[in-house]
């Protein structure tokens, strides 16, 4: 149907494995032309699924060079939409502008609560009774794009941060896969920084 690529920035590979497994089984009817990451150790995962892998290191001094490499890859492979499988970086504005409501992110909290890089730690400090995951379209405002899918799981005082992270990772996989499927099936209508998702 369309072309998607998976951006992977940190060594959190649970969402990547899940997407590739669903792709391989035919659940996600989409082509994945390549995977790009700043970690070479994810290359064997891409190889095992027969998907081209590109290692693009990210640093403050080489941020512009990395951005240009990403744009070249996106254009070369005629990418239709982008999936950020725990990207954990701020997406460049020119890429967001080139793919309006076509960049799908997974955030490891129930937005709008606990934005940023360590929401499980923040949730633990607040003593929350539920944790969640949110998949949304990327906009120039951090973790504030139109929400496609969310889900939650109950937790208690007995859970450690490690427990919260483990429970959250299971949610992240399901929420991201559901959001991708809704996007592929053209079930998402965006308006006023919100979405209507048709069932």
Explain the meaning of each model-derived region.
Residues 2-7:
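Short, small-residue-biased leader/transition segments that mark boundaries at the very start
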Residues 8-14:
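Short, glycine-rich nucleotide/cofactor-binding loops
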Residues 15-24:
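Histidine-anchored nucleotide/phosphate-binding helix
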Residues 30-41:
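Short internal beta-strands
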Residues 31, 52-54, 102:
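Conserved beta-strand segments of alpha/beta enzyme cores
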Residues 38-39, 62-66, 77-199:
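Donor/substrate-binding cores of folate-linked one-carbon enzymes
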Residues 43-48, 96-98:
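Short loop/helix-cap segments at secondary-structure boundaries that form the rim of catalytic
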Residues 47, 51-77:
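Adenosine-nucleotide cofactor-binding segment
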């Amino acid at each position: 149907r369309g072309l998607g690529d998976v951006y992977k920035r940190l060594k959190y590979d649970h969402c990547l494995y899940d997407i590739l497994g669903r792709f391989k089984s035919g659940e996600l009817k989409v082509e994945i032309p390549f995977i790009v990451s700043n970690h070479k150790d994810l290359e064997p995962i891409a190889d095992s699924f027969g998907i081209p892998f590109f290692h693009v290191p990210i640093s403050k001094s080489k941020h512009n060079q990395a951005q240009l490499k990403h744009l070249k890859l996106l254009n070369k492979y005629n990418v239709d939409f982008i999936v950020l499988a725990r990207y954990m970086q701020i997406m460049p504005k020119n890429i967001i502008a080139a793919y309006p409501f076509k960049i799908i992110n997974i955030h490891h909290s129930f937005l709008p609560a606990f934005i940023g890089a360590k929401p499980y730690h923040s949730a633990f400090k607040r003593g929350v009774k539920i944790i969640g995951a949110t998949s949304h379209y990327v906009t120039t405002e951090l973790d504030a794009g139109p929400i496609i899918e969310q889900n939650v799981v109950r937790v208690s005082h007995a859970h450690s941060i490690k427990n919260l992270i483990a429970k959250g990772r299971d949610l992240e996989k399901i929420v991201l896969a559901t959001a991708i499927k809704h996007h592929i099936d053209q079930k998402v209508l965006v308006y006023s920084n919100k979405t209507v998702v048709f069932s």
